[in-house]
């Protein structure tokens, strides 16, 4: 995708993400598909390992030990993928490969035997706090803090089991933190952060403190509260959606996120799988499309 595009303010860009569901388009697709619970849980496990919606759709069709056998083929990446060539891996899970990935699959087999769907069910529980969910996630080999955040978000938004997030948990990741620092420096719509001693926090991204990052986050939550959190629309936008907006806005400003980037790329990646999998075809059809 071209890097030559008009750069939007975070207010404009966030409104676009929320209005077009490019914030997390996969979430909407999964809700539309209405997969049986066990298959949805297998889909989630495959996605959390591989970060490819078409591939996860294909793998979700296998049950029991056969699911783990196919997941191990993806981990080893020796046998050709059903779509030809190598089994794809999303950039976000680029470290889930080789010997580490096969050891991850071995751990899952040892723990869940012939019931791969139990992994997502265990991680989800009944929801709870972000820290409770991510603690369960990180019991699993090669499931660290970042994928823990993603799992917690999908438990809340896809499975509909409420997870409460807090700023400290969200802003332990560098990209949203850096984006919030930049926002405080460059965005005149964000009011000054008045400190406890009555002074004003300096508008310098290098000097921004966690307290000022919290100030920025609260401002953005207030700004976007007119939007309901997709895809359920059951509550106003909150910190986890603001985290995603900040991450994608930073990428947008650096020339790496033109409008509709996720929708376009996820659909393109799913299309080859739609030719070999009915579930992948359903996933492709359920994905939101680019709108004008």
From Swiss-Prot:
UniProt function note: Transfers glycine to 5-phosphomethyl-2'-deoxyuridine (5-PmdU) to produce 5-Nalpha-glycinylthymidine (Nalpha-GlyT) on DNA as a step in the pathway leading to thymidine hypermodifications in the viral genome. As a final result of the pathway of hypermodification, 5-acetylaminomethyl-2'-deoxyuridine (5-AcNmdU) substitutes for a subset of thymidines in the viral DNA. These modifications probably prevent degradation of viral genome by the host restriction-modification antiviral defense system.
Reaction it catalyzes: 5-phosphomethyl-dUMP in DNA + glycine = 5-N(alpha)-glycyl-dTMP in DNA + phosphate
Family note: Belongs to the thymidine aminotransferase family.
Keywords noted in UniProt: Host-virus interaction, Inhibition of host innate immune response by virus, Restriction-modification system evasion by virus, Transferase, Viral immunoevasion
Molecular function terms from GO: transferase activity
One BP annotation, GO: symbiont-mediated evasion of host restriction-modification system
The protein's name: Glycinyltransferase
Lineage of the organism: Viruses, Duplodnaviria, Heunggongvirae, Uroviricota, Caudoviricetes
UniProt xrefs under InterPro entries: ADDT
